[in-house]
Every structure is written in C-alpha cells, then in structure tokens.
C-alpha cells in the first residue's frame, strides 16, 4: 500500500490518480475508471469522487491510501 500525502482534507479521485502518477490526463483517468476502481472496497466510476484522510483506492493493481497533512 502506498500512502499519498495531500494538503488540506480532501482530494478528488481524478486528482489522486494524477498525483500518484497512475494517470497522465483525462483520457487516462476515464480508461482507468472503466477498467474498475475501488474506493474503500466499493466500485467507483466518478472521477470527481471526494476522498478524505484514510480512504483507500485500488486501481490498476495498486493500492493507495490518502493521508491528509494539515
């Protein structure tokens, strides 16, 4: 599991995928979401889904955990 540190208390799913270098842009994000992404074990298809401290994202064989910094 890889921790992704964010500023503030929220990040959107699409932004997280870019920050983690899983997606390069909008087209990549769309393809990844179509292949299947889990947020806290539940399927998610919305790139705008809000993620908060402790949320877990499973995408393209990687597991990410959101860690909020202040």
Predicted regions and their residues:
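Short, Lys/Arg- and Gly-enriched loop/turn segments at beta-strand edges
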Residues: 64-70
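Short beta-strand segments
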Residues: 2, 62-64
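A basic, amphipathic helix-loop patch mediating RNA/tRNA/ribosome contacts
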Residues: 11-52
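A detector for short, charged/polar N-terminal pre-domain segments
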Residues: 1-11
């Amino acid at each position: 599991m890889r921790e992704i540190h964010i500023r503030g208390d929220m990040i959107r799913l699409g932004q997280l995928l870019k920050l983690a270098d899983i997606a390069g842009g909008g087209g990549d994000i769309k393809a990844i979401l179509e292949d299947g992404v889990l947020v806290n074990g539940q399927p998610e298809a919305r790139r705008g889904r809000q993620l908060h401290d402790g949320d877990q994202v499973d995408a393209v064989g990687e597991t990410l955990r959101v860690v909020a910094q202040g």
